[in-house]
A protein has these predicted regions:
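Periplasmic/ER-lumenal interhelical loops and adjacent helix-loop junctions
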Residues: 44, 48-59, 90, 229-315, ...
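Membrane-embedded helix bundles of polyisoprenyl
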Residues: 20-21, 111, 115-129, 134-219, ...
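Start-transfer (signal-anchor) and selected internal transmembrane alpha helices
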Residues: 1-33, 228, 232, 438-444, ...
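Active-site-proximal, structured, solvent-exposed surfaces of multi-pass membrane proteins
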Residues: 2-5, 53, 617-833, 838-839
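Transmembrane alpha-helical segments
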Residues: 118-126, 165-177, 205-213, 305-312, ...
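Membrane-interface coil-to-helix junctions
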Residues: 22-122, 142-163, 195, 202, ...
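Contiguous transmembrane helix-bundle modules in multi-pass membrane proteins
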Residues: 176, 180, 199, 323-343, ...
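Extracytoplasmic/lumenal acceptor-recognition loop(s) of multi-pass membrane glycoenzymes
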Residues: 447-467, 479-550, 582-616, 714-717, ...
């Protein structure tokens, strides 16, 4: 019996893992995703952020670099915070064994594995809960693994560990409440928080409700019983948080400096949509929502309609259980629809796209209820099956009449009707014992697999060209490989695929797109006329003056540059490397009144840059051209050969088209409301440009020519006594500088409390210069300076994590020894009983 039991259990667990994996691989074959073709599964942020960050992580591991800081993106970032937000899954460390050219595939097939593990974890939970190991548990595990949530968000690889761990955390909490055993709960929740704190916030909020629900269902016998349960829940929850403290604390400190670090509680209550509209999204083939609309992605098999109704009618399931689980499910539906609840669930923020990120918990709940109905189906009558079938079909027909969402195609309703009829027929045959159990299981698995394959294939797995993403990588590496590395400088790609190209190709850069982006740098970027938004800033719109201030020594161009003011270095195929002749080091000296004198509040960043040159006593670098405004069009003609820029003064204009008299071709510039200069490049005299917007808004724009002679003046003034870098590594910078009276060392290193600075061996507190950068007030004379980065909260976090793990180990040892003592006593007692019986 034991081997038979294991076979059944393993059968269900293997099916729950391998069927979703096989379905995903089948879809990959159809989509020609590598190695089955030349496409890749780089969807949205996976394309722009995750692939570069995984590349940077792998590079650091393989080259023995610190995981605390990175120079390759954002002018320098707290990598421990970026790691905590994007990379903290323990499975990600396997990337050290992956070759560089397969980083995308490592991510892609890790997603597939995690989808399979999600199904396995859900099935394991249902087996442990029901103490049954039949194949039926796998049906609901497959539904969990290939849910609408996964169809919408499976590319969000950083969330998937939490999806896997949720059933195990729930099982651990049930053991804690019912058996007073908290180790599994603390370990699984600790792993979840460590892997992704953001999704774990939602899990923790759910656990509070679930803890109360478990107490209600179990029944509380006394105040003492209640107090002990609450104390244990709080204690093991704190231990779980403590386990993750080493990763979590640096992340918390870093997020305080982001644009998302503030809270704006909604003042008006708004309902987004009706319950019918939401529940209709349980149908297969419904297009997923990942944009700014609030629709939840809650599909997990259309059979849910049948089973939830059967669950509510089943007399073997207690009324208390039904009330608790149904109430929790309704609360989740309300949370999807009501803005205040939506705001709270998302960590007291409105999500910037990717709505209803907590909906996987709702899916877990409804699948549990569906499984309970399946498990107790023998208690349902044929009449109840008929009522559930009619109710399900009736709801689908009602939804077809009332739902007006764009996500519902013609076939959604008909496929749902057919599938409900098939599942109802299978249940009827099972009820009447007119079908062999093995045949029933196989038929159900086949139909369920077809449904899940169709839904995932229709609503998920978009692709991009793998070749296009990687085509210039080898050439970029070739042009950079022979550059000297004895001092610090930055690069920028003129034509980028992402803002995080520096991380993808491992060179020091300015641009960054990350949820950990510092708000101060975004603000400063806009002031200087380079692109910036809530969680990103880039070199787009940069002038040579900005490049100079940011220590951008080299530009990586696709094709040759016609600008005579940059110096050719080398090229590889169509990738060219040019050197900017005027580049300041990572630090430069300014006078004591520099920061207060520089006015960065001008409407135009051209005025901001010119004001900088004015206060250091040099000529303006951006010279305004004469132009004409005519409704939604602005035109100007270049007065002489040079580098030209256009700035759109109206931030309500998002997209413009620029046409030159030279080629008469429209060039579209998007997101100009992000405050960046439109770089027209180096052009001849007498070229007429027209700038227009198609929204018929009044065009308010200005054109400028850049003056390289003025740039040299500014460079000579700021580089009189430069900061000379003598050594630097992934978290340290050392150098010397000869300061005048009351001069300030202004760096292009983003300010962070984690920097520790020593001036001539004496620890010196740095300050925030220009509200953005690391700055040092120096005394007159030559100084040796050392700067080292250690994230805020790292050492306290290590102590807390170490202490929490130690406490868990001691608890485990204590209960293990206690169990051995009790087992020994029981054995001795049985021996005594046997001896007495023999006498």
């Amino acid at each position: 019996m034991k081997s038979e039991s294991w076979f059944k259990r393993a059968d269900a667990l293997l099916a729950a893992f391998f069927i979703p994996v096989a379905i995903m691989i089948l879809i990959f074959v159809q989509r020609q995703i590598f190695p089955f073709g030349d496409n890749s599964f780089l969807r949205t942020d996976m394309y722009h952020q995750y692939a570069p960050f995984f590349s940077e992580f792998q590079y650091k591991l393989k080259h023995g670099q610190s995981l605390l800081y990175s120079w390759d993106i954002g002018m320098g970032v707290n990598f421990s915070a970026l790691y905590a937000y994007y990379l903290a899954s323990p499975l990600n460390w396997l990337i050290v064994f992956c070759p560089k050219f397969l980083v995308i595939e490592f991510m892609t097939y890790m997603i597939v594995v995690k989808i399979g593990l999600s199904g396995l974890a859900m099935t394991y939970y249902l087996q442990k809960y029901s103490k049954k190991e039949g194949m039926g548990t796998a049906f609901f595990g497959i539904g969990y693994a290939l849910s609408g949530y996964m169809a919408a968000y499976s590319w969000n690889i950083m969330w998937l560990d939490c999806i896997i761990l949720l059933p195990l955390i729930a099982l651990g909490l049930e053991r804690l409440v019912n058996k007073k055993k908290g180790l599994m709960y603390a370990i699984c929740l600790g792993l979840s928080i460590t892997s992704n704190y953001y999704i774990s916030i939602m899990i923790c909020m759910f656990l509070i409700f679930y803890f109360v629900a478990l107490l209600v269902m179990r029944g509380v016998t006394s105040k003492k019983d209640f107090f002990i349960a609450v104390l244990q829940f709080g204690f093991f929850s704190l231990l779980a948080g403590g386990i993750s403290a080493m990763v979590l604390l640096p992340e918390i400190f870093a997020l305080k400096a982001t644009a998302s670090g503030t809270f704006n509680f909604p003042q008006v209550y708004v309902a987004y949509f009706s319950i019918i509209d939401m529940v209709a999204r349980h149908m297969p083939g419904v297009e997923t929502e990942i944009g700014l609309d609030h629709w939840p992605n809650i599909y997990c098999g259309v059979g849910i309609y049948l089973f939830i109704l059967l669950y509510l009618m089943n007399k073997k399931i207690s009324l208390k259980e039904k009330a608790v689980y149904f109430t929790m499910s309704l609360f989740f539906l309300a949370s999807f629809a009501i803005d205040v609840l939506n705001y709270i669930w998302h960590g007291f923020h409105y999500p910037n796209s990717l709505p209803a990120r907590q909906s996987f918990i709702y899916i877990f709940l409804v699948l549990f209820m569906a499984f309970r109905a399946y498990d107790k189906f023998r208690a349902n009558t044929l009449k109840e099956l008929g009522m559930a079938t009619v109710g399900s079909l009736g709801f689908i027909l009602l939804a077809q009449k009332t739902v007006e969402q764009k996500h519902f195609g013609f076939g959604v309703y008909y496929a749902s009707l057919i599938l409900i009829a098939i599942y109802a027929l299978l249940l009827y045959l099972w009820k009447k014992k007119r079908i062999n159990v093995n045949a029933l299981i196989i038929a159900t698995l086949v139909i369920l697999s077809v449904e899940m394959t169709a839904n995932t294939g229709l609503t998920s797995v978009t692709t991009v060209s793998r070749k296009d993403y990687k085509d210039d990588n080898a050439d970029v590496a070739n042009v950079l490989k022979d550059l000297p590395n004895d001092t610090f400088y930055r690069f920028e790609k003129v034509t980028r695929k992402t803002k995080d190209d520096g991380a993808w190709m491992n060179f020091h850069s300015v641009s960054l797109f990350s949820s950990t982006a510092r708000a101060a740098l975004s603000d400063f970027s806009k002031e200087m006329g380079t692109e910036a938004s809530t969680n990103a800033y880039s070199i787009t719109g940069s002038t040579p003056l900005v490049d100079m201030l940011y220590a951008v020594k080299y530009g990586i161009y696709t094709g040759e540059s016609n600008d005579p003011n940059v110096e050719y270095v080398t090229h590889s195929n169509n990738i060219y490397l040019y050197e900017n002749p005027y580049t300041l080091p990572i630090g430069y000296l300014v006078g004591p009144g520099f920061e207060t004198s520089w006015d960065r509040t001008f409407r135009s960043p051209a005025d901001v840059q010119n004001n900088l040159t004015q206060i250091i006593g040099t000529s303006p670098v951006l010279l305004e051209e004469e132009g004409e405004k005519d409704g939604s069009t602005y035109t100007f003609t270049t007065s002489e050969k040079g580098r030209y820029y256009v700035y759109i003064n109206d931030s309500s204009i998002k997209t413009v088209k620029v046409k030159s008299s030279k080629d008469n071709i429209d060039q579209t510039f998007e997101n100009v409301d992000r405050g960046y200069f439109i770089d027209l490049g180096y052009v001849d005299k007498g070229i007429t440009y027209s700038v227009r917007n198609d929204d018929n808004k009044e065009m308010d724009a200005s054109a400028y020519r850049f003056d390289y002679k003025a740039l040299k003046e500014a460079y000579d003034m700021l580089n009189i006594s430069p900061f000379t870098v003598t050594h630097y590594d992934s978290r340290t910078v050392e150098g010397t500088v000869d300061a005048g009276p009351e001069e300030v060392l202004m760096t292009s290193i983003p300010y962070d409390e984690g920097w520790t600075v020593y001036v001539d061996g004496v620890k010196t507190k740095p300050r925030k210069g220009l509200d953005t950068f690391l700055a040092l007030d120096l005394t007159e004379g030559k100084h040796e300076i050392k700067m080292k980065f250690t994230p805020q909260g790292l050492y306290p976090g290590m102590v807390i994590s170490g202490g929490s793990i130690l406490v868990l180990v001691l608890i485990a040892v204590f209960f293990n020894r206690r169990k051995k003592v009790l087992d020994t006593k029981e054995e001795n007692h049985q021996e005594v009983l046997q001896e007495n019986a023999q006498k």
